[in-house]
Amino acid sequence: KDNPKKQMARQMIVMVNTINRTNFGGRRVVTCVTCHNGSNVPATIRKLDAVYGTPTTDEPGNITRQAPGAPSVDQILDKYIQAVGGADRARALTSWVAKGTYIGYGDASPVPLEIQAKAPDQRTQIVRTLSGLSTTTFDGRNGWFAAPDAETPIPLRALAGSELEGARLDAQFAFPAGVKQFLTSWQGSIPATLGEDRDVYVVQGASASGLPVKLYFDFETGLLVRQIRFVEAVLGRNMIQVDYDDYREVAGVKMPFKWTWAWQSGQGKIELTDVQANAPVDAARFARPAGAAR
């Protein structure tokens, strides 16, 4: 027999699904976050500091129209291409090889990392953990994850669903020249603020599965500073956030040397120390891994 918490969770799932089915045609308009927002007990009284204190910046909802006075999606993406070095230089970047470090949430110290990427959408990331090599590969169509037995119950598995889609986006965004083709169904742009004082424009498109993907571009520099994509789950959509920082010029193209991935159950940070542009990359680098190696 399941414990009371599991029984309650199942009852809540049924309740939320019933609300959405009855009132919104089955669309996931109401989720656990709508009421609980991270708390075991939903708040029923509004706090006064929410009325009289400094307003907090919430994640913008779905963008459905162009904000008055904001630049168009094309203008924002064109400025981004100019910011990284211009269309000609961006197109001239066809591959790159990088070294750096990776640290996960709760890890004691960073470990060595290598990335090989080839335009338009191939990417392999190798993290040298204490247990062995952890490899994520996307060959332009298929993806795999290989890791030591000590870190995963399945040493080699094919990526599917949201994991495969995320690997594709990471491979595509390694080469900014094609940014307009990465997503479809662009919805317009809105101004927003990250943190306390970073003004950005947010544009929204759709991934191959139709889920929204939001891109955040700095007001002044035009550079991409954040990507947010979504994963469909039983309890609603989960968010995956990728932050880009420390842009440096490599062969005339500005590239982020710091990336931070954050999701519901973890976080990973990459810091690159060396990037070689247009370095030769063997096609075998993007093949299905043989399995975890030491």
Explain the meaning of each model-derived region:
Residues G69-D74, I81-W96, A174-Q181, E196:
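N-terminal helix-cap/turn-to-beta initiation motif at the start of protein domains
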Residues T124, T129-G132, L194-A292:
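Gly/Pro-enriched, hydrophobic low-complexity segments
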Residues P42-R46:
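Short Cys/His-rich "knuckle" micro-motifs
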Residues K1-R27, K47-T64:
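Sequence context of c-type cytochrome heme-c attachment sites
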Residues K1, V29-S39:
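The canonical Cys-X-X-Cys-His
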Residues F145-F173:
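Acidic/charged, solvent-exposed loop-and-adjacent secondary-structure segments enriched in E/D, K/R, S/T
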Residues I81-E151, L183-G188:
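N-terminal mature ectodomain segment of secretory-pathway/periplasmic proteins
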Residues C35, K47-D78, R294:
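Intrinsically disordered, low-complexity terminal tails/loops enriched in metal-binding residues
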